Regions:
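Structured adenosyl-cofactor binding patch, chiefly the S-adenosyl-L-methionine
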Residues: 179-235
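RNA substrate-binding interface of SAM-dependent RNA methyltransferases
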Residues: 39-150, 214, 226-229, 233-234
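A structural motif corresponding to the C-terminal end of an alpha-helix
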Residues: 129, 133-136, 177-187
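Extended, non-globular alpha-helical segments
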Residues: 11-54
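Short Gly/Pro-enriched loop/turn and capping motifs at secondary-structure junctions
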Residues: 146-148, 173-176, 194-196
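Structural alpha-helical scaffold elements that stabilize or flank donor/cofactor-binding regions
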Residues: 161-162, 181
Length: 236
């Protein structure tokens, strides 16, 4: 009798383990299906916005003191269709690897997950970043109040389509842009202000400036895309 009693006692436990295993499998399958749908939706969105992306446009953040502000700028960059973000990070607050950046919680949270869909590259110094940009034929504009001896212009006076490859720099929250970045820039851009307060924070500045830059370059791209299409029709 004892073996039979032992068997019947084990049977409910066996069923419980089986049900738990089946539950895990069902949850795994459900999770995989959700991930598949999310990827499909992301691919669809990527296809929809592809023609609106501003190629050869980079936003450069120079030595931001708060990592959360990087996330805010990345969010602006992604929403406005800027191609890449470069971060001069002499404090080494960011990981070198892009994949590791995407998994950095503070960046993911403040960028509202935009870091997952944005290309971000870090540099140890301003000089290293400038050398990389110049090697790849990028022209640099810096955002800064009027600087004596430099070419200065108001945001609404600048043609941001004159340079095929353009890098727009944003300085440190308290100290602003560095002298090294200014010296290697083609122009200093300022935002017109009409109040008692004459400054914006990094997130606001990047949003205002990049909106104007991307608006101009997107219209330029659209114009020449239409021209190319007309040319193709004539040659057909």
């Amino acid at each position: 009798m004892s073996p039979r009693l032992h068997f019947t006692a084990e049977r409910p436990a066996y069923k419980l383990r089986l049900n738990l295993a089946l539950g895990k499998i069902e949850r795994l399958i459900s999770s995989m299906e959700e991930e598949k749908q999310e990827k499909s939706s992301a691919r669809k969105r990527a296809d929809e916005i592809k023609e609106f992306q501003c190629k050869n446009l980079i936003a450069v953040i120079e030595n931001p003191s708060n990592i959360k502000n990087i996330g805010t700028v990345v969010r602006n960059v992604n929403a406005l269709g800027v191609e890449k973000v470069y971060v001069v990070d002499s404090r080494k607050s960011l990981p070198d690897d892009w994949q590791d950046m995407r998994e950095t919680r503070s960046l993911s949270k403040t960028s509202v997950s935009a870091i997952k869909w944005s290309f971000v590259k870090r540099f140890d110094s301003t000089t290293e970043c400038i050398e990389h940009l110049e090697k790849n034929n990028f022209v640099s504009f810096v955002t800064s109040p009027h600087i004596k001896g430099q070419k200065n212009a108001s945001l609404d006076e600048v043609d941001f389509t004159e340079n095929h490859k353009l890098a727009v720099w944003f300085g440190n929250e308290s100290q602003g842009i560095s002298g090294t970045a200014v010296e290697h820039s083609q122009m200093c851009i300022s935002i017109p202000m009409f109040g008692m307060i004459e400054s914006f924070n990094l997130g606001t500045t990047s949003g205002i400036v990049l909106y104007e830059v991307t608006k101009q370059r997107r219209e330029y791209q659209r114009k020449y895309r239409r021209r190319d299409k007309r040319g193709l029709k004539k040659n057909a």
